[in-house]
Amino acid sequence: MQITPDNIIFYQYQFVVINATLVYTWLTMALLVIGAAWVTKKLVVRPKLPPWQNFLEIVVDGIYQHIAEVTQQEPEPYLAFVGTLFLFILTANLLTVVPGYQAPTGSLSTTTALAIAVFIAVPIYGIRQRGILGYLKSYLQPTPIMLPFQIIGEFSRTLALAVRLFGNIMSGNLLAAILLALVPLFVPVAMNLLGLVFGVIQAYVFAILALVYIASAATVQEKKQSISMEENS
């Protein structure tokens, strides 16, 4: 059993390397895109909905409600990005029940790419909510001396997101490999079930942390506005 999918090489020619991380990442994305296209064509608006549509509506509504609870804002601006992050990580982790499949989230390159996507999304959402000047001013608060620390904080949060997901998935794979070597008959079934639960939790935690980072700028702005209104009153 491989601890990380980076070690599984499917093709290599000079500096071109196609490993399991790349293959299974694209496979996961392809499944999500094809599934989304199929679902979009099959959606119905009738009193009696098919079971799969009921299930998907429950999932989307759950994501919607969690965004509203965490951000205390309208969920629509965050739903597509955060929902995509959650569904990608969830699908990548749940596919581990397929023999031979290795979750791409067990590779630091994949988790770093996801963290960089969040890193880029933070200023995009911040500028959209507060304007470019308002967002840039947040790096100078409460004093301009904090500017280098604010910048370091942005990079450290990105690094923490990447390393946290990678470390948790890799440690889970390592634990499964150790237990499989000790008790090869009964452990695989139990570890598969535990891995499914673990994968759901990791997808949820990563999405929530990303949501908190993205929404923090607008939340701070709203708090400052409410404080100033109270002082004026």
From Swiss-Prot:
Q: Name one GO biological process term.
A: proton motive force-driven plasma membrane ATP synthesis
What is the membrane topology noted in the UniProt record heading this document?
A: Multi-pass membrane protein
> Chief location of this protein?
membrane
A GO cellular component annotation here is: proton-transporting ATP synthase complex
Under Gene3D superfamilies, the record lists: ATP synthase, F0 complex, subunit A
Which CDD domains does the entry link to? ATP-synt_Fo_a_6
Q: InterPro entries, from UniProt? A: Alt_ATP_synth_F0_Asu, ATP_syn_F0_a_bact/chloroplast, ATP_synth_F0_asu, ATP_synth_F0_asu_AS, F0_ATP_A_sf
Q: Where in the cell is it found?
A: Cellular thylakoid membrane
MF terms in GO: proton-transporting ATP synthase activity, rotational mechanism
Q: Which UniProt keywords apply?
A: ATP synthesis, CF(0), Hydrogen ion transport, Ion transport, Membrane, Plasmid, Thylakoid, Transmembrane, Transmembrane helix, Transport
List all membrane-crossing ranges: 15-35, 78-98, 107-127, 169-189, 194-214
**Is Transport among the key words of this record?**
yes
How does this chain assemble? F-type ATPases have 2 components, CF(1) - the catalytic core - and CF(0) - the membrane proton channel. CF(1) has five subunits: alpha(3), beta(3), gamma(1), delta(1), epsilon(1). CF(0) has four main subunits: a, b, b' and c.
Q: Which HAMAP family match?
A: ATP_synth_a_bact
Name the family the entry cites: Belongs to the ATPase A chain family.
Record's function text: Key component of the proton channel; it plays a direct role in the translocation of protons across the membrane.
State the PANTHER family in the record: ATP SYNTHASE SUBUNIT A, CHLOROPLASTIC (PTHR42823:SF3)
Instruction: List the protein's name.
Output: ATP synthase subunit a 2
User: Which species does the entry assign this protein to?
Assistant: Picosynechococcus sp. (strain ATCC 27264 / PCC 7002 / PR-6)
Native organism taxonomy: Bacteria, Bacillati, Cyanobacteriota, Cyanophyceae, Oscillatoriophycideae
Q: Which gene encodes it?
A: atpB2
